[in-house]
């Protein structure tokens, strides 16, 4: 798993090559019929499981915030068993690392005759059932993922979903300036991830604080909430430590009652505005003897155990 974590910069660099050109993201990377389909999209439905569901939830913020498209994200094991109302010209998206997740494939099959505009599959395995059965396909090119917990597949899924957002945004009023800014951020992403890999010693030190803990809370606001969800899932999967994720503003609505010196609180807040909003949470956690760990950009808040990540 550690090997696959460290492969993320190179895998994302390889994914972007040839797909993000000087003129932007090429629509044809999703399939030859993609340009005709994408210009008709009026809504998006995303269905996935586990880590892929978290990637889809991040994409919801992008699709609604950048492309102005209503987007719903659901767990496949729930979505497949309920009655659905399909809005006109809805793009149906499934996400799966293996392309063989049973519940996700069942939803993909049912969507064929449910009135969706088209079915887009995002996966890592070209020969998978999901890739074969979808109308459009985006391959994440992360390479074989042997680790039990998804790492490089998750981040390459996010890159693919952001590129999709940029394409759909072109058809729904996203400015060229905004698109160029995001394109430049994508180009810089491999180097930014390289800098994150240099935090290994600090992360090991943090992990030692968790060694004897039995519970943990993960917090995030907005688009960072699903990232917190992914962090909690990883701690459960790999460390067998119970962890839950909450929107940061919800800490006082129940979870705070569980915080004590034996429950660390991890916050995902990679910008100064969100970090400032955590000050009241810090005081509440401290009052109960807990410790707050923050993944952020600012070193201004010395009271926090800050894991500094590049912007």
What is the predicted role of each segment?
Residues 7-45, 126, 134-264:
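Active-site phosphate/pyrophosphate-binding segments
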Residues 36-174, 179-188, 268-307:
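Glycine-rich phosphate-binding loops that contact phosphosugars or nucleotide phosphates
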Residues 309-311:
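A short, hydrophobic C-terminal helix/tail in secreted or cell-surface proteins
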Residues 3, 233, 283:
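Short alpha-helical basic/polar micro-motif
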Residues 1-7:
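Flexible, low-complexity linker and terminal segments
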């Amino acid at each position: 798993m550690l090997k696959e974590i460290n492969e993320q910069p190179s895998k994302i660099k390889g994914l972007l090559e040839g797909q993000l050109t000087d003129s932007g993201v090429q629509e044809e990377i999703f399939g030859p019929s993609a340009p005709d389909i994408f210009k008709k999209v009026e809504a998006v439905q995303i269905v996935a499981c586990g880590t892929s569901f978290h990637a889809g939830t991040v994409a919801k913020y992008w699709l609604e915030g950048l492309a102005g498209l209503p987007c719903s994200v659901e767990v496949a094991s729930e979505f497949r068993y309920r009655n659905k109302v399909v809005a006109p010209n809805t793009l149906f998206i499934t996400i799966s690392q293996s392309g063989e997740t049973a519940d996700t494939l069942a939803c993909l099959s049912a969507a064929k005759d449910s009135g969706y505009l088209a079915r887009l599959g995002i996966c890592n395995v070209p020969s998978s059932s999901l890739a074969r059965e979808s109308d459009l396909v985006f391959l994440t090119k992360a390479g074989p993922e042997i680790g039990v917990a998804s790492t490089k597949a998750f981040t390459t899924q996010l890159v693919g979903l952001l590129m999709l957002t940029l394409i759909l945004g072109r058809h729904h009023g996203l400015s060229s300036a905004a698109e160029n800014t995001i394109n430049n951020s994508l180009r810089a992403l491999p180097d930014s991830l390289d800098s994150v890999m240099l935090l290994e010693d600090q992360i090991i030190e943090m992990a030692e604080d968790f060694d004897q803990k039995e519970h943990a809370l993960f917090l995030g606001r907005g688009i960072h909430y699903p990232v917190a969800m992914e962090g909690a899932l990883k701690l459960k999967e790999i460390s067998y430590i119970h962890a839950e994720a909450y929107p940061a503003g919800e800490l006082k609505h129940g979870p705070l009652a569980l915080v004590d010196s034996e429950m660390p609180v991890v916050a995902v807040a990679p910008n100064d505005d969100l970090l400032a909003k955590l000050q009241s949470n810090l005081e509440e956690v401290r009052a109960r003897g807990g410790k707050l760990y923050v993944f952020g950009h600012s070193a201004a808040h010395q009271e926090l155990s800050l894991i500094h990540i590049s912007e």
